Amino acid sequence: MKAAVVYYSRSGVTKKIAEKVRAKFNADMIFVEPEKAYKGFASSIIRVIREKKGKKTPAPKTPAADFSAYDIVFIGFPVWAATIPDFLQEYLRQADLSGKRVIPFATAGNNGKEESLAALKALLPDSEITDYFYTSMKEKADADAWLEGIRA
């Protein structure tokens, strides 16, 4: 079983979970970067709001990988404006994950659990999305327990 971890983390919270996934499944890591980096917390919020209002989808700097050799693809992201960051959505549109088992994990301040999962399902209709993990400041979840429950 070959696994990949595709993730973005501005603050390092999502990265910590990505590293746990890598260690447990001996997964390859793919850090997806936006063309223009998001800086501090407050400036990132302002920028995301402006991008949403202007309907500007920022492009990913990271080119879509070839996932043909992978059985499982973990996708990790922070929840921004109740969904997956736009540049990561664009990356996923470019990636061919058809027929792949996709296991998402999301970190959030306080909302977007259902919305981000719905967005992922809409982006990847031909993928099998399982074992969704979500943790937030309001809804704490144990990543180690989640990982132990995943059947590879």
How would you label these PLM feature ranges?
Residues M1-I75, A82-R93, D142-A152:
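N-terminal beta1-alpha1-beta2 submodule of the flavodoxin-like/Rossmannoid cofactor-binding fold
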Residues I75-G76, P104:
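Redox-cofactor binding/interface segments in oxidoreductases and associated redox assembly factors
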Residues I103-D142:
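Short, glycine-/small-residue-rich phosphate/pyrophosphate-handling segment
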Residues F67, R93-K100, A122-L124:
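Short, conserved loop/helix-junction motifs that constitute active-site signature segments
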Residues K2, N26, G99, D126-I129:
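A generic structural signal for alpha->beta connector loops
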Residues V32-K36, K55-P60, R101-P104, A119, ...:
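Short, surface-exposed, polar/charged, turn-prone segments marking secondary-structure boundaries
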Residues G12, G76, G99, G109-G112:
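Glycine-centered flexibility sites
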